[in-house]
Amino acid sequence: MWTALVLAAIVAGGAVAYGGWAYLAVGHGAPLWPFIVGIPLAYLAIPLLLTIFWFVLAWWFRAERPADIHLALPARIAMFGREFRALARSAPRMILYRWLMPDPKPAPASLPILLLHGVGCNAGVWSGFRRHLEACGIGPVYALSYGPPLASIEHFAEQVAEKIGDIEAATGAPQVIIVGHSMGGLVARAYLRQFGGAKVRRLITIGTPHHGSMHAWLMAGMSLAQMRPANAWLATLNGNADGADGVPAVSIWSWHDSMVTPQTSSRIDWGENIVLTGIAHNALLDDPIVWAKVVEQIGRAATSGSPA
């Protein structure tokens, strides 16, 4: 709710300011058509500038990459375009998250999926991802919007525990599969550390900064502070040899992540790593390759039985 309200206020404020400017300009003889054409351009300018900014930072703090994953210029342009598209889609998705991501109707189920979003987002960012899972016959698929946005990761983990309880009550399923994007993976791990892994069949993280991200230094908030490299909270979380507290885990990450820096921060040594190239941070949620990898992992979890 918090993120949707903030975004809606920003969009509404921008629309009022833009409309007022257009009204005054047209009143003084300016043509109307440039302002009409400028409506989508004004909106798209924001994700464009953010995409450029994140890519510059990602290059500056980049991890040393193997020579064989170098991207040619056309591939780099395509990657930039996909990330820009993902960011441009995110605001309307998050504003409309209650309509796009309602909980499934209560019904018996064997292995529900729970999606956990990253910092500053809400369940709306998963809308395309969930549609694909459901099209593959996977479900029921739930998503949690936790908040307030900049609270501690432990606070979010408590909300995950409540959500898992709600899912169990609605489906009768004793376990869920958790899929976490970005900070969502850390929220899942914090849940496992606080509440144990008895109710989680498998943990799938996507673009999660398991060892922190330099980008987190640019923003304020408790959850951001917990994602800064080498901070005490992360050191404690990573202090156990098993970072998922006995739950089978996989980290899906990209050498070209635009917000996890260095990109190798997503690498884990207590689970499986699925390493991709040519996909930036937000575009991971809309990428067919990532979808296929997650579907495969869910299938493996469904046939593996409950962990001991």
Where are these regions (language model features)?
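Flexible, membrane-associating and regulatory peripheral segments of lipid-active enzymes
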Residues: 1-113
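Short, proline-enriched alpha-helix->beta-strand connector loops that line the catalytic pocket
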Residues: 109-111, 244-249, 268-272
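Conserved loop-alpha-helix segment in the C-terminal half of the alpha/beta-hydrolase fold
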Residues: 255-272
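Acidic beta-to-alpha connecting loop that harbors the catalytic carboxylate
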Residues: 255-256, 278-280
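Post-His helix in hydrolase/transferase enzymes
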Residues: 285-299
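Generic C-terminal helix-cap and adjacent flexible tail
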Residues: 299-308
